Each structure stands twice: as C-alpha cells, then as structure tokens.
C-alpha cells in the first residue's frame, strides 16, 4: 500500500559485559525509514533509508556487518553483489530503492501484455566507515574472535569517500509468482573476489 509519509523506526541497543555471557559493553543506534509511493503512470516505488552508529570499540561482528548475498535467491534487504561479511562499519548510511513499472513497458507488446509481466529496476547505495581502533581489535592475536571470523571473512571497511553501489533490473510476475533479476556491481570492482554480476530469483505467493 502507498504510504504518504515514511514509516520511521529508531532503535537503541545497550550491551552489558558479563550479562548472559557478553564480552563487551556497547551502545548502538539505528534509524530506518521506509516508504512506498506512486509515480503516476510510471508505476510505483519504494525505498528504505537506514543509518547506524556506535561510539563503542568492538570486534567487527558486533559492529554493523552489511548483509551480502552469495546465493541465487533474492533477499530484499541484502546487497546482491556483496559477499558475506565483505564490509563492516561502525557508522553508515544507505538507501535501497526499488521501482515497478507495472504495465508501462510490457503492456505495449501484445503477446507480452497477456502474460502480465512487470519490468522492475532497483539501486542500492551504501556509505560507511570504520575507526582504526575497531580495526586493531580484530588484528589482536589474542582475540578469541580472530581465528573464528577473520580468517573466513573479509570484514573490511568502506572508504568514507567512496560508496558501495549496485543496480538491478528484471521481470516480475512470471507465472504470477516468480521474479528474475540481474544485478551489476558498480564500485569496489577490484576488492577481493567481487561479484560483478549476479542473476537472482525469488518467489512471491499472494493469498
């Protein structure tokens, strides 16, 4: 449903060292805004804006690991061309935008019109950074988290002056339930073993 104003969620978390086995005391604040709206005959759009900050010095898994996706199944809140735990930040801001053109394009093609396919497009942009103090925690050879996480995943930080960006496009409403999308990574193309192109699918059941 179209939302005339964004739905805003503000979340604060405090961790207590020693409580339920916790190793750190920390504070985290996360802000999220979500809205759907129509663009007249152009179709409908939705966006999710998210920002987070922690002043605490913590190992990477307790900061803000950005959600990557290495599968072929589309996950709406994930970055489709980002690897698992490829980037982590202690402060970040992101926007994820999706647009459904509805019948604007395919309804002009007689045979395709009967199938009721819908052309979709999306774009994700993420800005973030990580303080050097948090980098050093994961470099500590005495850290119990080092062998468990650091050797398996990158946990790198983003350049605060260079966003992570990706775009996608595809077809929705195939057989009324299937969506197929292609995604292109636009930045950090030489970072590790990047996923420059991904083809993904998802299934949506409506009752």
Give the location of each predicted region.
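Exposed, low-structure sequence patches enriched in small/polar residues
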Residues: 1-207
